[in-house]
Amino acid sequence: MPTAQPMQEAEGRRLTHYRIFNEVLNGRNVELLPQLCTQDYVYHGPGGLELEGIDQLRGMIEGYFTAFPDMHMEVEQRVVEGNLISTRWRVTGTHDGPLDGIEPTGRKIDIGGQVIMRFEGTKVAEEWEFFDELAMLKQVGAITE
């Protein structure tokens, strides 16, 4: 039978996961990131994107908030294994702000992706995120078939 400490940490990781999706992303509250991520946080994203530290993570998230002011993320599936949480998600939004040099088009996006979060204690230390950037660029009208 698991001891109280690992069970408390497991529940803490689930709560952190919930807070990232619901309070940080959907609630637009990046000020919570230091409570939820380690100081030496690392992000591995599509196209070889590598971010180090909470400030770089905050910058990326705020960039998406600017590009898609009505952005909403939905957790479709979550799998917990030890200090890892894997999440299949879907994001929707309207391209009403600049996105990496792409002027706003007013077009809607609806794309799926997956993120694997590695925890140290109850804080996220590292993430690997995968989503179809090509589909997003097509949906905002930045590229055509």
PLM features per residue range, with description:
Residues 1-145:
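C-terminal and inter-domain tail/linker signature
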